[in-house]
Amino acid sequence: MPTIHRPRMGSLAYSPRKRAKSPVPKYHAWPAYQGEPALQGFAGYKVGMTHVIMVDDHAHSPNEGKDIMVPVTVIEVPDMRVAAIRVYRHDTYGNHVLTEVWADSFDKELSRRLNLSKNYKREEAEKKIREALEADKIVDVVALTYTRPSVLTGVPKKVPDLMETRIDGGSMTERFEYGLSMLGKDFDIRSLFKVGQYTDVTAITKGKGTQGPVKRWGVHLRKRKHSRGKKERHVGTLGPWTPHHVRWQVPMMGQMGYHQRTEFNKRLLKIGEDGAEITPEGGFINYGEVRARYVLIKGSVPGPSKRLVRIRHAMRLGEHKIREPTIGFISLESKQG
């Protein structure tokens, strides 16, 4: 058997492993879209996990056509609202915000998050954007959307979470006109996603604070005579003599968890309206009852309960096709143990 060389477990691509700047995840890329202008993402709050019994509809699967048990994550997704339209221009240094067009009505919920300038004039902002569109200087159009946690009982917060959601489809002018038509209006997840569709989910993972190299990087415990130095949960070496400093690749203690992570190709199994049909006996642990619209995502989702989860169309879809699953049973057994 060959010698196993494993200086660490975990990718260095995620370095530096530090705390996320915000509990609201940010998307830096969106999948290609062809069609009429439409919003490209949604957000909800993680409730917890349960399991369902469904028919395995994957072709050539050993259990094709048979009932299988599938773990699912419940995400509560009340309607979101469009607060503003933001456009980007491009120069030598990258994309920059040109200006924003805000809705005429500034509701009480959003006023908890930010204050609109008293000197703001919507007509001037629209005129500036239209002139830039005619000059072909606009490279992207996004909507500033926000959640409404005040309608939920499981999330103890009233301040909405504000985020950018891309508008795609058609020309830049068509996207901008679509955004103007959505200002101040609500939209729900049913207008963006279909049951059986594959999605990408993004959230901030559970925070675990400062951890040592054994738990953080999976290095081996020091054994036999190496442990006689009264240090067992330490890395064996900090590096070579030269260069005369500790390199960043050396597995060391530090922050673990509370990082932004994206999981690809998570299948959306159900969009439900009645929370009672999914709430287990005694409610979900650390959350309670589901009262608003919800979705079932196959498998796990990053983060603890009550954490904001963003959903977008799958970027690495491959050959997956949209097939509405056949769910025969949803477990309502108590999660209290």
UniProtKB/Swiss-Prot annotation:
Keywords: Ribonucleoprotein, Ribosomal protein, RNA-binding, rRNA-binding. One of its GO terms (molecular function) is rRNA binding. GO terms for cellular component: cytosolic large ribosomal subunit. It comes from the Archaea. GO terms for biological process: translation. One of the primary rRNA binding proteins, it binds directly near the 3'-end of the 23S rRNA, where it nucleates assembly of the 50S subunit. Belongs to the universal ribosomal protein uL3 family. NCBIfam families: L3_arch (TIGR03626), PRK04231.1 (NF003261). Part of the 50S ribosomal subunit. Forms a cluster with proteins L14 and L24e. PANTHER family: 60S RIBOSOMAL PROTEIN L3-RELATED, LARGE RIBOSOMAL SUBUNIT PROTEIN UL3. This is Large ribosomal subunit protein uL3. It comes from Methanospirillum hungatei JF-1 (strain ATCC 27890 / DSM 864 / NBRC 100397 / JF-1).
